[in-house]
Amino acid sequence: MSELLSFALFLASVLIYAWKAGRNTWWFAATLTVLGLFVVLNITLFASDYFTGDGINDAVLYTLTNSLTGAGVSKYILPGIGIVLGLAAVFGALGWILRRRRHHPHHFGYSLLALLLALGSVDASPAFRQITELVKSQSRDGDPDFAAYYKEPSKTIPDPKLNLVYIYGESLERTYFDNEAFPDLTPELGALKNEGLDFSHTQQLPGTDYTIAGMVASQCGIPLFAPFEGNASASVSSFFPQNICLGDILKNSGYQNYFVQGANLRFAGKDVFLKSHGFDHLYGSEELKSVVADPHYRNDWGFYDDTVLDEAWKKFEELSRSGQRFSLFTLTVDTHHPDGFISRTCNRKKYDFDGKPNQSFSAVSCSQENIATFINKIKASPWFKDTVIVVSSDHLAMNNTAWKYLNKQDRNNLFFVIRGDKPQQETLAVKRNTMDNGATVLDILGGDNYLGLGRSSLSGQSMSEIFLNIKEKTLAWKPDIIRLWKFPKEMKEFTIDQQKNMIAFSGSHFRLPLLLRVSDKRVEPLPESEYSAPLRFQLADFAPRDNFVWVDRCYKMAQLWAPELALSTDWCVSQGQLGGQQIVQHVDKAIWKGKTAFKDTVIDMARYKGNVDTLKIVDNDIRYKADSFIFNVAGAPEEVKQFSGISRPESWGRWSNAQLGDEVKIEYKHPLPKKFDLVITAKAYGNNASRPIPVRVGNEEQTLVLGNEVTTTTLHFDNPTDADTLVIVPPEPVSTNEGNILGHSPRKLGIGMVEIKVVEREG
């Protein structure tokens, strides 16, 4: 209803101003600004819904000041461009409409009415309400009743008798199991769901709406609210260190806790969370690649579900035979948005909806088959009678190709339990949420029936039943939950451990690189993650007087304040204010100790603007002074005009990437020497090794042969035509995820370049 009211007020404002208000520059500017704000808010809501499926939430608030990089970003570029072009077109049209009667005399009453209606349209818009609520949640002090509802359970289960298998289905919400809405989509896993305890109304709350947040909610009974963006959790050294979570209780009760997934464990700090809470045995893409049957059978995130669940079955067999009490948690990935992935072993590879194939539905149908196969193996084993199997979604599906169809249904998370010791077949429609999952499992295993804010759905009352406004209540508790991190409020001294790549201050430890905003009573960490902007772009959003400490590779800050370190890949520390003084210190000891030293200086806005502009220079446009092209730092030598076909810098150098260009091209500002030696330090990838690689300058071509290890080769060139471009053509680029950023599309690698140097020859 508020959407209709908001739009009606907007339309009325436009019509009244355009036809009645007349000519007045000030009123025109004010009305256009407010109406433009309405448009921006609603486009933001539309775009946020596209990415999150949940409107403007915490993740969006963070992303408003940080770029979205990482998983599947290339698939969102076209919609993003469309939104920008649409916004420009709407603003242009709006300005044209408002000035239709600009030659008529100004009318104060109609101008005021139009402006008030415009303000009303903004106030009534759902986007404004969502943003207002989020901003309030950032500034609240908490809710006094948090302590009454947050309950820590006993640290042990008195007499544990059952092993636990807990399966997180990536985005595998219960809505997919509606056979009337989606016929025959999930027959195998749906049949198993109907044989167990099926909890049909598990809602999603703020702070539980992405994978690591869903895991924290289900195991600790609290939303993932942190003093930093949740997916950047990989940078912390401990995760809710004071909380008692399900893994802690299991370990204290004699369980060996295992976790198996196909993606990298470091993404979003899953490894940190699990190690902090009782898990000693973790297997992700790095740990599995030496044991799986086919290490090259991978999708953008890691190993396919059939591979992961095969390894989980092997681990279940091994642990069951040992007689040791255990829990085995696993997380699938094939149903990840925006499209999902199809494992090669499933029979259900294609699902049509609305008369055409749908990739997301197909991925769901395939993945549920793989999960069902895994469960049926356990059920057929002699160890099933001693096992509890839990299947849950980590969160509701985000915007995938099935999302618009899901939104037509009553959406809930998946949570069902199959008990080998005591088969129970029942659908329980009690109102609950993800935080109740851990407490319910704990209750079944013989422990307490509460865990944090979670309550057992078998013997307790969920917060979703107690509070009709549970979403608002959860946001009200946000400051209380953030305080559970015990995060420091000041930073005076700090220590950098180069071997561990960690920084420590005031009792907290973070992985490097790291940016910190330091104020009188707050230290805000801004880690670098797959979903966040590089730290220099985050620093560019700081206010002129904000105190910062930035620990990163020296070359990243050298272009601003320490040009002598432009080629150094060591750690450096920069601190100061963007509009004031900055210092850069080279970390030259294994254990390096520093102090914060912020001076209360006069702010220079010209200096501030210059710093911000420099920080925002994209990597390929950075230039440094050097007599060769050094590939393990960003940018290129000053002599280089532009380059293409080259991937991002890594610790050793850079790969060619045929996704960015079939050839490596380096164009220099001036013609290359008439005679010169080209000294290339490089290696080849895969089938490019031991094969002739053409290297061209103008009309002359030489051949380069590389192995899988780095070598240095000198080629002799004559350049009578004054050519200014060097071209290298890898013969057979290989599509691979090796060394790739998690969630990105595969790169096509050819050669790995460490250094290229042009040496002029006499004569």
UniProtKB/Swiss-Prot annotation:
It is found in: Cell inner membrane. GO terms for biological process: glucan biosynthetic process. It is a multi-pass membrane protein. Signal peptide: none annotated. SUPFAM superfamilies: Alkaline phosphatase-like (SSF53649). InterPro entries: Alkaline_phosphatase_core_sf, DUF7024, OpgB, OpgB/LTA_synthase_biosynth, Sulfatase_N. Pathway: Glycan metabolism; osmoregulated periplasmic glucan (OPG) biosynthesis. One of its GO terms (cellular component) is plasma membrane. Pfam families: DUF7024 (PF22895), Sulfatase (PF00884). The chain crosses the membrane at residues 4-19, 26-48, 76-98, 105-127. GO terms for molecular function: phosphatidylglycerol-membrane-oligosaccharide glycerophosphotransferase activity. The keyword Hydrolase does not apply. Gene3D superfamilies: Alkaline Phosphatase, subunit A (3.40.720.10). It catalyses: a phosphatidylglycerol + a membrane-derived-oligosaccharide D-glucose = a 1,2-diacyl-sn-glycerol + a membrane-derived-oligosaccharide 6-(glycerophospho)-D-glucose. Keywords: Cell inner membrane, Cell membrane, Membrane, Transferase, Transmembrane, Transmembrane helix. Its main location: membrane. Coiled coil: none annotated. Its EC number is 2.7.8.20. PANTHER family: LIPOTEICHOIC ACID SYNTHASE, PHOSPHOGLYCEROL TRANSFERASE I. NCBIfam families: PRK03776.1 (NF003000). Belongs to the OpgB family. Transfers a phosphoglycerol residue from phosphatidylglycerol to the membrane-bound nascent glucan backbones. HAMAP family: MdoB_OpgB. This is Phosphoglycerol transferase I. The lineage of its organism: Bacteria, Pseudomonadati, Pseudomonadota, Gammaproteobacteria, Enterobacterales.
